[in-house]
Amino acid sequence: MPGKANVEVTSTPKPIRHHAPKITDLHQMVVKLHGVNIGSISGLNDYTFLRLIGETGTDMNRFPTVKHFTNWCGLTPQNHQTGKVKKRVEGISCNKAGQIFKECAQGLLNSKYIAIGSFMRKLKGRKDVAIAIKAGAKKLAEAYYNAITKGIDYVEQGLKKHEQQLKIQEVSMLNRSAKKHKI
């Protein structure tokens, strides 16, 4: 990627609290590698990005779409059902990259101002903690894939906007239900 070597680094890195790597200017190296600031994705920092590059490599051409990437990470929901019969399948484990995304998602579970955290808490109430963490990890993996392959920066929409969208969705659902029952 010769065109991306001249990228100017203007952002500051996220702080790493525990087990910080002893690499000076890691943030600048990471941004110059792909030309995208991965630190804009909630839950991911430079060290996490370094670990993910170690697992996935720098060439993402082996994954044609985001669905192929999330499936390779082991973050897609598994539905072993035919007709009305659900098969009993032992838990399918993630690979190391999927586990890294799960660790990042678990850190966002109790976040106050991040939309992915709100999404996971809502899902945790309906399903299970493990399912919520896996779904949040899938969202992080999708944002990572889009940042690496397409250069799309992740923009955190925030908790208030997420809750407004949920409220609008709920109102439209109630309106449809009222029309259906002719109320």
Language-model features: where?
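A detector of single, family-specific signature residues
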Residues: 1-183
